[in-house]
Amino acid sequence: MPIGVPKVPFRLPGEPSAQWVDLYNRLYRERVLFLCQELDDELANQLIGIMLYLNAEEQNKGLYIYINSPGGSVTCGIAVYDAMNYIKSEVTTICVGTAASMASFILAGGDRGKRIALPHSRIMVHQPEGGSQGQASEVLSESQEVMRIRRQVGRIYSERTGQTLSRVSRDMDRDQFLSAREAKEYGLVDQVAVDTKWSTN
């Protein structure tokens, strides 16, 4: 049985008493965003709108995007990536479970030094997919667009990771799963978060 979105108390500045707001709205006020489902037009527009609003409100404060997503629409992923790099606020991306497909693209798109994977998270990269139906000319046009997008995504992965374009293209040919540590070595993230409760150091 679904429990819905939990409500938490929050007192607005200047208000005498707290009011109950849903958890996500409360966290938005702390500049914390979530990509925790398949990325589609609605979610992409919501993330972009929140980023633009928070950037306009306070450019000197960073944003935090927590990611646990199977990916989703390529064009939506590119739109979110572009918005992250358009705003002035620093963007920290944090993988808290799985960042697959376009979710790994967004993870890699965080500001340098601020791309984090939790110790047991996993990251997957692969080539953009496209499914075409219709007349031959339409199928050809669609396949050309998919190839153009694949080159674009590969080039951005290469820039963000420091890997050569040829290696990125080769790695994108099939689903490539990486542990948090492997993702750091590859350059998709800058750090693996430390397990503070059980660390012996």
UniProtKB/Swiss-Prot annotation:
Enzyme type, top EC level: hydrolase
Keyword match Hydrolase: yes
Subcellular location: Plastid, Chloroplast stroma
GO molecular function terms noted in the UniProt entry: ATP-dependent peptidase activity; ATPase binding; serine-type endopeptidase activity
Signal sequence residues: none
This enzyme's EC code(s): 3.4.21.92
GO cellular component terms, A-Z: chloroplast stroma; endopeptidase Clp complex
Reaction catalyzed: Hydrolysis of proteins to small peptides in the presence of ATP and magnesium. alpha-casein is the usual test substrate. In the absence of ATP, only oligopeptides shorter than five residues are hydrolyzed (such as succinyl-Leu-Tyr-|-NHMec, and Leu-Tyr-Leu-|-Tyr-Trp, in which cleavage of the -Tyr-|-Leu- and -Tyr-|-Trp bonds also occurs)
Gene3D superfamilies, per the entry: 2-enoyl-CoA Hydratase, Chain A, domain 1
Active site, per annotation: S101, H126
Alphabetic keyword roster: Chloroplast, Hydrolase, Plastid, Protease, Serine protease
Keyword Repeat set for record: no
PROSITE patterns (UniProt xref): CLP_PROTEASE_HIS, CLP_PROTEASE_SER
UniProt superkingdom: Eukaryota
GO BP field: protein quality control for misfolded or incompletely synthesized proteins
Record function comment: Cleaves peptides in various proteins in a process that requires ATP hydrolysis. Has a chymotrypsin-like activity. Plays a major role in the degradation of misfolded proteins.
Quaternary structure note: Component of the chloroplastic Clp protease core complex.
Membership in a protein family: Belongs to the peptidase S14 family.
HAMAP family, alphabetized: ClpP (MF_00444)
Protein's UniProt name: ATP-dependent Clp protease proteolytic subunit
Lineage, broadest ranks: Eukaryota, Viridiplantae, Chlorophyta, core chlorophytes, Trebouxiophyceae
